[in-house]
Amino acid sequence: MDEMDDFFGNDELDREPSPFGEEAIEDNTGEEGSRRIIEPKLLRTKKLTNPRLALNEKTLTGPKGITALREAFQNFNPNPKDDPYKNLEKMMKKYAYWGHLMFPKMKTEDVLNRVETLGTRRQVKLYIMKQRLGESTDDVENEKRETKSKNGIIDDGADDDEDDLFNDLPEKETPTKPINHTEKVVDSPEKKNGQVSNNDAEEEEYRMMEEERLREEQEAREAEAEDELMEDFDLNNDW
């Protein structure tokens, strides 16, 4: 018996450690002498590597949406003498090609049904009305101008020069002569004005950083809203 104890006595020490460390649980509820290790389940975190494409108002009013459809039918002139079904087939091929370029993952009939649903939305109606009136439909530029106008910045359409932005930053002062503390130092008006301009440059830089942060938060909220809209659409439609 002692020999058997010596043989199996160090079984617990010789067993390889579990890859889960101390989280492994030993189950002794079974028969005597039988042991099994219950490993905890790994929590699989869903990592979003690429943003999911969504067929929504933004896509339909973008460069691959209604604008591309108008360009596709710009030179389309059906022959009235031909068979009407042939003309219809040519037209549907253009619709199918346009739908594939805009959203390749969906079938043509599903794309057309989705476009019909989106056509009742206010953003799409406003976009079509602006196109008919010949007004600007560049939503990206309009959003940028609205954001800058809300923050009190007037956008004249000119690009900012990076060199000018860096020139506005305060320069590092290098002392050339040791200051005698016994002498009374009097700041000149030019030096005071330079300090005021440096403070203005720092405030301007901080304001630009704050605007960038707000813009990124707005884009994140819009992307989240688009994902929720697409999830609702997937749940309400059987593909």
UniProtKB/Swiss-Prot annotation:
GO terms for molecular function: DNA binding. Residues 169-193, 206-223 have a biased composition (Basic and acidic residues). It is found in: Cytoplasm; Nucleus. Pfam families: Swi3 (PF07962). Residues 1-14, 156-166, 224-239 have a biased composition (Acidic residues). The keyword DNA damage applies. One of its GO terms (cellular component) is chromatin. Its main location: cytoplasm. Keywords: Cell cycle, Cell division, Cytoplasm, DNA damage, Mitosis, Nucleus. It comes from the Eukaryota. GO terms for biological process: cell cycle phase transition; cell division; DNA replication checkpoint signaling; mitotic intra-S DNA damage checkpoint signaling; positive regulation of cell population proliferation; replication fork arrest; replication fork processing. Residues 1-38, 135-239 are annotated as: Disordered. InterPro entries: Csm3, TIPIN/Csm3/Swi3. Disulfide bonds: none annotated. The keyword Cell division applies. Required for normal progression of S-phase. Important for cell survival after DNA damage or replication stress. Belongs to the CSM3 family. This is Protein TIPIN homolog.
